[in-house]
Design a protein with these regions (language model features):
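Glycine-rich phosphate-binding loops of nucleotide-dependent enzymes
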Residues: 2-524
């Protein structure tokens, strides 16, 4: 009998000309939490998709309890006791918790009787592992933390002995993260093993027993938690591409002048009692008021889907206001005025980059001038200056480390991280008055994240105001001067930098405080 529950040996995987996994080795022991750490694009999710049967390896072997395992699909993985909770849940909103958990399981002969048995089993699993759920609750009414418990119970219901969690804390409040970690410890105490995929150092050091680091599709380091240090893990993740000791990402220390006091001058952007509807004409933002001063970074925290996108679009004239007013430099922002704003010192990095910020069939050079194509030096107002456009594109490709054959390459051939770099290069191509950035570092590796942070802080020093919308509290705490917290379309509070605290913000993110009280406190 092998000492390992799982062994992955020499795993290779290519997508066309791109090598995603290069001779990767990984082991998991019974009853342990293995942290799988790496930056964006390191190969973490690809490796786990191979293990779960969603991808087929080009070479290599998988052994479960010392025996070769042929995993050609998720059904084979489940047969071998391997379950996976994806970063984006696969659920049916119109079903109850119980119906989602048993969905896909055979219910023969007497479905009602079997549902009663399933209910009992789900309740037993929930109690054993600290995964409190109401089996009869409609899924659509539940928070992301409870939805995640449903996905974990779905795997445990199918007798998973090895549970893969892909970036499980991304959409959780700090309190929900603590609850998840408690459940994971209960699981390993009862013999379940866990592979915990993350790019966050703090998490692996808090909950994992061993840590394996991937970089550029290779396994470069495995350490026991007791011997792991922040600097060793960061160095393994990025190699020599980042000065660890001087890094904003690593040290968490922001350098630069303190923010201006907003009350000393007219704020640049003001939102007054704004209400905005979503695409179904349902309320997305309600009675939202705040101001951003010149040279200030205001963060917007909240679990995804609480109105962040609608607010950003309303502020920039992309989406109509149901009521209220937005002003920029004292002038009202009106619907349809977006192009004028973008041509006059405003930049927007949207959440849905492929839908709202990028043309996959156009060249990299085209994408780098979107919204700026009628302005010098790209144009004389009538004709495009392609020599200047291509020369400028080459400069931006180098400055922002966009991995592409050149300015004429088609955008569809870029990776997600490189598409994000194109959006960032376009945003910072000119002096800015206002930046509205929604998850600006998504899909980027650590050196690129560091580069973005430095760019934002450098522009802040010149007077640029920033609305930074992010689900990453570490990012918000590092960069922001003040922090607004959004819950179900309402601003629950606005905190000064001296009062940033993960648990206070987490409480606001879960709606624990009344909107009126917190808003007044935030502005006071």
């Amino acid at each position: 009998m092998s000492d390992f529950l799982l062994q992955m040996r020499g795993i290779h995987k290519r997508f066309g000309l791109v090598t995603a996994l290069d001779n990767v080795d990984l082991t998991v022991q019974p009853g342990e939490i293995l942290g799988l750490l790496g930056g964006n694009g390191a190969g973490k999710t690809t490796l786990m998709n191979v293990l779960f049967g969603l991808y087929q390896a080009d070479a290599g072997a998988i052994l479960v309890q010392g025996q070769s395992a042929a995993i050609r699909g998720p059904k084979d993985a489940l047969t071998h006791g391997i379950g996976m909770v994806h970063q984006h849940f696969l659920q049916v909103n119109d079903f109850t918790v119980l119906e989602n958990i048993v969905l896909g399981s055979p219910l023969r002969n007497w479905p009602r009787l079997q549902l009663a048995t399933a209910r009992q089993r789900v309740q037993e699993l929930a109690q054993r592992f600290g995964l409190a759920v109401d089996p009869d609750a409609p899924l659509a009414d539940l928070s992301m933390g409870v939805r995640q418990r449903v996905e974990i119970l779905k795997a445990l219901y199918r007798d998973a002995r090895l549970l893969i969690l892909d970036e499980p804390t991304t959409m959780l409040t700090p309190q929900e993260v603590d609850t998840l970690f408690q459940s994971l410890r209960l699981m390993v105490a009862q013999g379940v093993s866990v592979i915990f995929i993350t790019h966050k150092l703090r998490e692996v050091l808090a909950v994992c027993d061993r840590i394996t680091v991937l970089r550029n599709g290779r396994s470069v380091l495995t350490l026991a938690r007791e011997t792991a240090t922040d600097s060793a893990l960061v160095q393994a993740m990025v190699g020599d591409a980042l000065d660890v000791e001087a890094s904003l990402v690593f040290t968490g220390e922001r350098r630069g002048p303190p923010r201006p006091v907003v009350g000393d001058a007219t704020p640049l952007l003001v939102s007054t009692a704004v209400t905005i509807s979503d695409d179904l004409q349902l309320p997305a933002i309600t009675d939202c008021s705040f101001a951003i001063g010149v040279g200030e970074i205001l963060g917007l925290a909240g679990v995804a889907g609480n109105g962040q996108r609608e607010l950003a679009e309303g502020l920039l004239g992309i989406r109509p206001l149901v009521q209220g007013q937005v002003t920029l430099a004292g002038q009202p922002v009106r619907l349809g005025q977006t192009a004028h704003l973008l041509a006059n010192g405003v930049a927007y990095i949207p959440e849905a980059r492929m839908a709202d910020g990028f043309l996959p069939r156009a060249s990299v050079a085209h994408n780098l001038i979107l919204g700026q194509h009628r302005q010098p030096p790209h144009s004389n107002g009538r004709w495009l200056n392609w020599r200047q456009i291509v020369a400028r594109a080459r400069q931006q490709i180098g400055e922002f480390n966009i991995k592409t054959p050149g300015p004429h390459a088609i955008g569809a051939n870029l990776s997600g991280g490189n598409i994000q770099r194109v959006l960032l290069a376009r945003a910072f191509a000119r002096p800015l008055k206002l930046l509205v950035a929604h998850n600006p570092t998504q899909g980027l590796d650590l050196p690129s994240i560091e580069f973005v942070y430095q760019k934002i802080l450098a522009q802040r020093a010149t007077g640029m105001a920033t609305l930074l919308i992010s689900e990453n509290l570490d990012e918000l705490f590092l960069l922001c001067d003040r922090l607004a917290v959004l819950y179900r379309g309402r601003i629950m509070g606005i905190l000064d930098r001296d009062h940033f605290d993960a648990y206070t913000v987490g409480s606001l993110m879960s709606g624990a405080h009344s909107p009126g009280q917190q808003q007044e406190a935030g502005h006071g």
